[in-house]
Amino acid sequence: MEAIKGSEVNVPDAVFAWLLDGRGGIKPLENDDIIDSQHPCWLHLNYTHPDSAQWLASTPLLPNSVRDALAGESSRPRVSRMGEGTLITLRCINGSTDERPDQLVAMRVYMDERFIVSTRQRKVLALDEVVSDLQEGTGPSDCGGWLVDVCDALTDHASEFIEQLHDKIIDLEDNLLDQQIPPRGFLALLRKQLIVMRRYMAPQRDVYARLASERLAWMNDDQRRRMQDIADRLGRGLDEIDACIARTGVMADEIAQVMQESLARRTYTMSLMAMVFLPSTFLTGLFGVNLGGIPGGAWHFGFSMFCILLVVLIGGVTLWLHRSKWL
């Protein structure tokens, strides 16, 4: 493949544009640099920036079929061979930010053995680890190594987030054993996060597996083995997600049962109180009719005797309920 001049990938508002030195390090891309398979270029763009959008729409370095995908049209993880290049769409969890972690960040990549073009709208935190390794001189030396390191970092972030959700489920299960009901909507949000993760991580695992099996010219056998290991690791994470989804279903049933039992206890208590006070209510209502005068109204101890009668009646009903094992 022909070499590319640095001026051809000069985008003023690029997030960064670096030239891999082939030894695990990087240097800023200059206009007079020569980009080839020994010194590939990594161009990272925010496709919402005007200069970046213009470059994506007009550069002859990109096939026409990938322009819309790099500009944000593609969302689900997938991989497509485009002649000598490959278009890859990946998803990342930005779990350490204030954003809702169920909103996965999309990153789109077009690459061949000479250069890498990656685009995003929101920042992809997993790339910070790859950038840090490159700045320290311990990063990838070629395009294949770069892709493996990026996929590894994305999987690390996904695994950490899955582990956090798993810990939340364990805490929730422990609280349920103590009859502690979680706040309303907590379990629903947890289940939604798991389902969204399952929706995007399953095709992403397939992307990794396909990259491991494809005979891409810019990936060697060791890199393919590492990619397969990453796919297997993400597959284990998906198994954990499936188990967590099933556990949230069990917890939802348990929460419903606990709430139903609590409601039944309250209803039972109110029914017992009604049974205890129903006879006394009947007597007070009967005496309160006062059609022919209140019985015993002229007696000095009439009210006291009536109160004693009510106490005895309530006590008798309570004793009967107790012997009947209703109390």
Curated annotation (Swiss-Prot):
Signal peptide: none annotated. Belongs to the CorA metal ion transporter (MIT) (TC 1.A.35) family. The gene is zntB. The chain crosses the membrane at residues 274-294, 301-321. GO terms for cellular component: plasma membrane. It is a multi-pass membrane protein. One of its GO terms (molecular function) is cobalt ion binding. Zinc transporter. Acts as a Zn(2+):proton symporter, which likely mediates zinc ion uptake. CDD domains: ZntB-like_1. It catalyses: Zn(2+)(out) + H(+)(out) = Zn(2+)(in) + H(+)(in). It holds the Pfam family CorA. It is found in: Cell inner membrane. This is Zinc transport protein ZntB. Its main location: membrane. It comes from Citrobacter koseri (strain ATCC BAA-895 / CDC 4225-83 / SGSC4696). Residues 295-300 are periplasmic. The keyword Translocase does not apply. InterPro entries: CorA_cytoplasmic_dom (IPR045861), CorA_TM1_TM2 (IPR045863), MgTranspt_CorA/ZnTranspt_ZntB (IPR002523), Zn_transp_ZntB (IPR023714). Residues 1-273, 322-327 are cytoplasmic. Keywords: Cell inner membrane, Cell membrane, Ion transport, Membrane, Transmembrane, Transmembrane helix, Transport, Zinc.
